[in-house]
């Protein structure tokens, strides 16, 4: 039995093309996951006022400071909704490496990386509420933030420095 020569990536041992195809597939799935993950974060964030006793604690603040905290929290929620929505809506643009999408990916990656750094450097372990539920929640959220940061930074790096013709 004779086989005819073939010039596909598999037969030509073009491992770089195969690697880029695999990375493209991984980011294709990854972008759907990180887009949805932002809405998972919102589920956790909507529990914060109740679980952390904001109703009691915020009474101690002057009205302006209390309103300021609520407004800043609202803008944080709006930012997370925008990140998730834009990631899902611009999925193809992120995968293609369009300039605006890469700018957004870089910004979102920096946002989540900064969130992790603030948690690690600024907050002390003693600052966090005690109890197993808070410990597990904190670990899971930090892992999710890390996944988001790695995904967006990884996509940016792949398009800008690692991808052929990038």
Task: Please tell me what each predicted stretch does.
Residues 3-6:
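Cysteine-centered motifs
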Residues 32-35, 70, 74, 102-109, ...:
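Hydrophobic alpha-helical segments of membrane proteins, primarily the transmembrane helices
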Residues 137-155:
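Final/C-terminal transmembrane alpha-helix of multipass membrane proteins
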Residues 19-30, 36-79, 89-97, 130-134:
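Interfacial loop at the N-terminal end of multi-pass membrane proteins
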Residues 90-113:
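Short alpha-helical packing/oligomerization segments
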Residues 46, 120, 148-151:
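Polytopic transmembrane helical bundles with strong interfacial aromatic enrichment
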Residues 150-166:
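Juxtamembrane boundary at the C-terminal end of a transmembrane helix
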Residues 113-127:
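Transmembrane alpha-helical segments of integral membrane proteins
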């Amino acid at each position: 039995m004779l086989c005819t020569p073939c010039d596909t990536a598999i037969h030509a041992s073009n491992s770089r093309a195969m690697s880029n195809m695999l990375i493209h597939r991984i980011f294709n799935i990854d972008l759907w996951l990180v887009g949805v993950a932002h809405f998972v974060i919102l589920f956790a964030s909507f529990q914060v006022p109740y679980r952390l006793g904001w109703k009691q604690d915020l009474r101690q603040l002057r009205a302006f400071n209390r309103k300021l905290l609520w407004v800043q929290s609202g803008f944080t929620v709006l930012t997370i909704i925008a990140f998730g929505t834009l990631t899902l809506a611009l999925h193809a643009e992120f995968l293609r490496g369009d300039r605006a999408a890469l700018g957004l990916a870089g910004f979102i990656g920096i946002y989540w990386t900064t969130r992790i750094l603030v948690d690690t450097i600024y907050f002390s372990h003693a600052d966090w509420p005690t109890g197993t539920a808070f410990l597990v929640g904190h670990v899971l959220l930090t892992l999710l933030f890390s996944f988001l940061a790695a995904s967006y930074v990884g996509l940016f790096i792949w398009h800008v420095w690692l991808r052929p013709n990038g």
